[in-house]
């Protein structure tokens, strides 16, 4: 074992030498005191969690999960094909199909699995398919496209002109699919969705949109950016997550009956794994239903996002300007990014996880701030002041958002 241990040790040491070693923070979240948590016996404010609207602690969602737990027990009992096709997950899929105005939906154990296994399976169903994928697509999309072994073209980030050039190079009668995200999680930029839809129609391509960072948050009923733009019906496959705005766990796709059924019968990431337990499916269904009916959380969320960005501008904190709720602060150095994160936590009681390579390109290391409706004006002010002090201590330049945005945008798409 010592021979192999040496290999693993060298690999870890290399990561440490590059300032990329990840240490997970031990947290005790507080359902009755969101967005606070306990860390090292101290109360902290969380500014980096994906529970965007705090739905994991919503009274309706918690009560629904308690009721389901007492009624059905903890586990699902098996795969969907063998004992695990519980009524709760069927109700969830019906709710998701309705959310996106599609004929059918299919639930997976995570958003990663939904992307990975669906995209790879499309190539099994259509062996001649060609993928067109944005260069900054999520690792789950990259994994699915890569494991499909299908022909692929990677277009420059958000560049529809480059996408069209690539589409033109492929026979119009050959199966093809454009894969993109509605909002990119590390920079917060929105895709030009309607332009991509138009190109798909022009060149006879399917469209696959990842809405994981936008479902629940945008649109009249929480259907994401596609619903906001009133174009859900023009997108062939909408993929999303239950683990962010909806506050639970799991991923899904929605589309027409035949496509969803084909994936159900083909995707190994769906077939060969235990299904979501009823306690989770029921909680997710109630979360979706609530956010279909209530705009209160979305309105408050956008108010906090605006206040946070305004505060950063007032303090000259160099965040990456975008139209979304994701607020990245580019540090550009892995050591300083880690130091800033640790100082925020240990000195100021503020938890913001730093993001380093391989999640983001080298030289674009960052802090990613995630506002929620529960963040107060005082929390925003405390965070802003803490960042100013930390930037001074670490010799990180305060610069205008406009200048930084242009500089980093070039790095992101180079």
Curated annotation (Swiss-Prot):
Gene3D superfamilies on file: Aspartate Aminotransferase, domain 1, Type I PLP-dependent aspartate aminotransferase-like (Major domain)
Record-listed N6-(pyridoxal phosphate)lysine modification sites: 244
Keyword field contains Lipid biosynthesis: no
SUPFAM superfamilies linked to this entry: PLP-dependent transferases (SSF53383)
Broad enzyme group: transferase
Pathway where this protein functions: Porphyrin-containing compound metabolism; protoporphyrin-IX biosynthesis; 5-aminolevulinate from glycine: step 1/1
Binding site for pyridoxal 5'-phosphate: 185, 213, 241, 273-274
Active site: 244
Catalytic activity reported: succinyl-CoA + glycine + H(+) = 5-aminolevulinate + CO2 + CoA
GO molecular function, one term: 5-aminolevulinate synthase activity
Binding residues annotated for substrate, in chain numbering: 22, 133, 152, 359
EC assignment: 2.3.1.37
Recorded coiled-coil stretches: none
Cofactor(s) the protein requires to work: pyridoxal 5'-phosphate
Biological processes, Gene Ontology terms: protoporphyrinogen IX biosynthetic process
Record's keyword terms, sorted: Acyltransferase, Heme biosynthesis, Pyridoxal phosphate, Transferase
Keyword Cytoplasm among UniProt keywords: no
InterPro entries to which the protein is assigned, alphabetical: 4pyrrol_synth_NH2levulA_synth, Aminotrans_II_pyridoxalP_BS, Aminotransferase_I/II_large, AON_synthase_class-II, PyrdxlP-dep_Trfase, PyrdxlP-dep_Trfase_major, PyrdxlP-dep_Trfase_small
PANTHER family on file: 2-AMINO-3-KETOBUTYRATE COENZYME A LIGASE, MITOCHONDRIAL (PTHR13693:SF102), CLASS II AMINOTRANSFERASE/8-AMINO-7-OXONONANOATE SYNTHASE (PTHR13693)
Subunit structure: Homodimer.
Homology family: Belongs to the class-II pyridoxal-phosphate-dependent aminotransferase family.
Protein name in the entry: 5-aminolevulinate synthase
Native species: Rickettsia felis (strain ATCC VR-1525 / URRWXCal2) (Rickettsia azadi)
UniProt lineage: Bacteria, Pseudomonadati, Pseudomonadota, Alphaproteobacteria, Rickettsiales
């Amino acid at each position: 074992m010592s021979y192999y241990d040496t290999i693993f040790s060298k690999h870890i040491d290399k990561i440490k030498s590059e300032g990329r070693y990840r240490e997970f923070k031990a947290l005790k979240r507080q359902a009755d005191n969101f967005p606070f948590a306990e860390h090292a016996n101290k109360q902290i404010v969380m500014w980096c969690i994906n529970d965007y609207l705090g739905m994991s602690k919503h009274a309706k969602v918690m009560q629904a999960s308690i009721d389901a737990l007492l009624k059905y027990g903890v586990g699902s009992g098996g795969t969907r094909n063998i004992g695990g096709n519980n009524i709760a997950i069927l109700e969830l899929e019906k709710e998701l199909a309705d959310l996106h105005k599609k004929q059918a939906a299919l639930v997976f154990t995570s958003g990663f699995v939904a992307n990975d296994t669906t995209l790879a399976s499309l190539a099994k169903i259509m062996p001649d398919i060609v993928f067109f994928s944005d260069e900054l697509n999520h690792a789950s999309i990259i994994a699915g496209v890569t494991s499909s072994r299908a022909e692929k073209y990677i277009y420059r980030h958000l560049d529809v002109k480059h996408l069209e050039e690539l589409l033109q190079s492929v026979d119009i009668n050959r199966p093809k699919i454009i894969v993109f995200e509605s909002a990119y999680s590390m920079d917060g930029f929105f895709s030009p969705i309607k332009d991509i839809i138009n190109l798909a129609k022009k060149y006879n391509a399917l469209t696959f949109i990842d809405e994981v960072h936008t479902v629940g948050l945008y649109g009249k009923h929480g259907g994401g950016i596609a619903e906001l733009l009133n174009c859900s019906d023009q997108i062939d496959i909408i993929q999303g997550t239950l683990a962010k705005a909806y506050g639970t766990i799991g991923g899904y796709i929605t589309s027409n009956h035949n496509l969803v059924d084909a994936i159900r019968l083909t995707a190994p990431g769906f077939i060969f794994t235990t299904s979501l337990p009823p306690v989770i499916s029921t909680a997710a269904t109630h979360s979706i239903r609530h956010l279909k009916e209530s705009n209160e959380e979305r309105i408050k969320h956008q108010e906090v996002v605006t206040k946070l960005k305004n505060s950063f501008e007032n303090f000259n904190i160099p965040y990456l300007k975008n139209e979304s709720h994701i607020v990245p602060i580019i540090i550009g150095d892995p050591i300083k990014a880690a130091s800033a994160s640790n100082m925020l936590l240990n000195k100021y009681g503020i938890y913001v996880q730093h993001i380093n390579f391989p999640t983001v390109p080298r030289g674009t290391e960052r802090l990613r701030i995630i506002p929620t409706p529960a963040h107060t004006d005082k929390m925003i002010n405390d965070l802003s002041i803490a960042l100013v002090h930390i930037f001074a201590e670490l010799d990180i330049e305060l610069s205008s958002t406009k200048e930084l945005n242009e500089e980093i945008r070039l790095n992101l798409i180079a």
